[in-house]
Amino acid sequence: MARGFFITLEGVEGSGKTTQAATLADALRNEGRAVIVTHEPGDTRAGEAIRKIFLDPEISLDIASELLLVLADRAQHVREKLRPGVEAGNVVISDRYSDSTVAYQGYGRGFDLPLLRQLNQLATAGMIPDLTIVLDCPAEVGIARTRERVKGKPHKFDRFESEMLEFHRRVREGFLAAAKEEPERVKIIDSQQSYETVTAEILAAVHQLIEARCR
């Protein structure tokens, strides 16, 4: 069986990646492709337990503890869902993956980047996305979108939604840096464009990936 594709969507809070991941999956299924949509943290049984601690703003975590939690989640995710899904020939779409760890814990929290990358390599077991789409917008825009989305609804802001604006600006810098470091893998799309335009640009990037494999 031919190997599938591993695609990740990344971005700051409120960038629209979760919505676009679902839209991309629908578009690819309409083309007759087998698709799995997943997310980090929390899309395994162990991950669900980790996610509760990881995102709870009332639990004080040392930066190393925070990092190791998300990496434990990733190790389970790779073993249980990501690698089996791709090896079975699916297009696997993950809402967040390793670039989020570099952006949030590395750039946002200031954890040592070389060490973080080494630990991330252990968690991923060398599984690298075929394509990463970063939905980019200023941190101010993303936070405003997040607050507008939950306006009038019962919502408890998680550990990262509760962070100060400067933290989210550093996180954005981390995602932009990833695109500069690995331009072949990481593509930036302006998420301030219309929903339809963003959708079209994501699908075009994915089609380019698939067509390149077929050449």
Go through each PLM region and give its residues.
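Conserved lysine of the Walker
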Residues: 17
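Hydrophobic anchor at the beta1->P-loop junction of P-loop NTPases
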Residues: 9
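P-loop (Walker A) phosphate-binding loop of NTP-binding proteins
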Residues: 12
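NTP-dependent small-molecule kinase module
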Residues: 23-25, 140-215
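Extreme N-terminal, non-catalytic leader segments
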Residues: 1-5
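Hydrophobic positions on the alpha1 helix immediately C-terminal to the Walker A/P-loop
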Residues: 20
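ATP-dependent small-molecule kinase phosphotransfer cores
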Residues: 27, 33-124, 201
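A glycine- and Lys/Arg-enriched "phosphate-lid" helix/loop adjacent to the NTP-binding pocket
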Residues: 101-173
